[in-house]
C-alpha cells in the first residue's frame, strides 16, 4: 500500500478555452485613425449608411453611457490611365470627441458625418477612448450585436483572434484572392453562410501555389510521420493519411466529399480555425495516460467554444452536422448528377467517339489590386488615407496563421 504526499493530480474539469481576441484598448494613442475597420459602399455615390440597430460597434470595454459617436466618410481613389479615378467611399467610426471631427458635439450637422448612439447613451459626454496609432495597433473587427448597416454597404471579415501577425497574411491573401461578387449585406450574421467554404479553400490553394512546391518525397514524409504529427499533403485523401473514416469512435470526422478532396475541401480550412494549437492541446486539455500492451496511450480532452453571436456560428454547426460520423454521406448540394444516356455507356475501341478539339482559353489579365489605392496621391491624401487597411474585396477572408497549419508544414 503506497503512502506519501499527494501527487498534485486533480479530477477537476479541464478549462474551457473560449474563442476571442484582443480587446480594444481603453485609452487611445497619438494616432488619428479609427479603432475599427471600415464599412465600404458597394457603389459610387451611395447615400450615407443607415443602421438596423444603434450603429455603434460592439466594445465591451465601454459602459452603455459611453456608446456613442459618428461615422465619417473617407473618399477613396485608385490609379488609372487618366491619372486616378474614384472608388466607393469608406466610412470609419469614431467616438464623440475623438478623431477628425473631435471639435463637434454629438448631433452637430456636417457633411460626411453620421451620428449614432446606443440606447441609454449620454450623448452630452465626450469619450476618452482616443484614436488608434496604426503602427502600434491593428484595426478591431467590426461586430454589431443589434444590427449592422443597410445593404448598400459591406465590410471584410476579420477573425476576432487575429494578432498583429495577421496583417501580412491578410495582405498576401488579398493580393491573390478574388472571388465573384454577391448580393446581400456584407458581414451581417444573416449573410455569412453564403460561400465561406469556397473562400477558405481558395486561400489554401493560392498559398500553396505561391509557396514552395512540395516534392513527392516531402509529401510522402508528411503523410507517414508519427501519427500525431501527420498533415495531409496536396493531392492526398484523408484516409490515405489518417485511415478510413468511422462512426462513433476516433476517426469519425469527415464525409465522403471531404475524404476525397482532402485539404482542398474548404470545410477543412474552416474547422482548422477551431482546432487547438499544440500548446493549447497540451496545457488546456485534460490529459489522461493509460498503459497498454503496445505502449503508453495519452488521451487529450479539449473543448473549444464557439459563441452563438460568432458571425460563422451557423457555418460551424452546419459543417459539424455534415462531417461528424459523416462517412458514407455527402453534402446535399454536392450529390452527383445522373449521367446522360450517351455518357453512361462504357467506352470501347470501336464505339468511343473521337475527342473534340478544345479551344484554347484566353488567359485573363490580373486585375490591379486595391492595395495600389494609395499610389499617385498627394501627401495630404496619403495622410488621410493612411488608415485604409485591409482594403479587400468582399470575398477575402483571413483565417489566421494557426488555421493554415504552417508550423506543421
UniProtKB/Swiss-Prot annotation:
CDD domains: CoV_N-CTD, CoV_N-NTD. Residues 31-156 form the CoV N NTD domain. It is found in: Virion; Host endoplasmic reticulum-Golgi intermediate compartment; Host Golgi apparatus. Residues 1-32, 44-84, 121-194, 238-258, 327-409 are annotated as: Disordered. The modification Phosphothreonine is found at residue 378. GO terms for molecular function: RNA binding. Residues 70-84, 358-367 have a biased composition (Basic residues). Residues 215-331 form the CoV N CTD domain. Residues 15-31, 162-179, 341-356 have a biased composition (Low complexity). GO terms for cellular component: host cell endoplasmic reticulum-Golgi intermediate compartment; host cell Golgi apparatus; ribonucleoprotein complex; viral nucleocapsid. ADP-ribosylated. The ADP-ribosylation is retained in the virion during infection. Disulfide bonds join 320-323. The modification Phosphoserine is found at residues 190, 192, 379. SUPFAM superfamilies: Coronavirus RNA-binding domain, Nucleocapsid protein dimerization domain. Residues 180-192, 247-258 have a biased composition (Basic and acidic residues). Residues 226-333 are annotated as: Dimerization. Residues 29-160 are annotated as: RNA-binding. Keywords: ADP-ribosylation, Disulfide bond, Host Golgi apparatus, Phosphoprotein, Ribonucleoprotein, RNA-binding, Transcription, Transcription regulation, Viral nucleoprotein, Virion. It comes from the Viruses. InterPro entries: N_prot_C_CoV (IPR044344), N_prot_N_CoV (IPR044345), NCAP_gCoV (IPR042547), Nucleocap_CoV (IPR001218), Nucleocapsid_C (IPR037179), Nucleocapsid_N (IPR037195). Homooligomer. Both monomeric and oligomeric forms interact with RNA. Interacts with protein M. Interacts with NSP3; this interaction serves to tether the genome to the newly translated replicase-transcriptase complex at a very early stage of infection. Belongs to the gammacoronavirus nucleocapsid protein family. Packages the positive strand viral genome RNA into a helical ribonucleocapsid (RNP) and plays a fundamental role during virion assembly through its interactions with the viral genome and membrane protein M. Plays an important role in enhancing the efficiency of subgenomic viral RNA transcription as well as viral replication. This is Nucleoprotein. It comes from Turkey coronavirus (strain Minnesota) (TCoV).
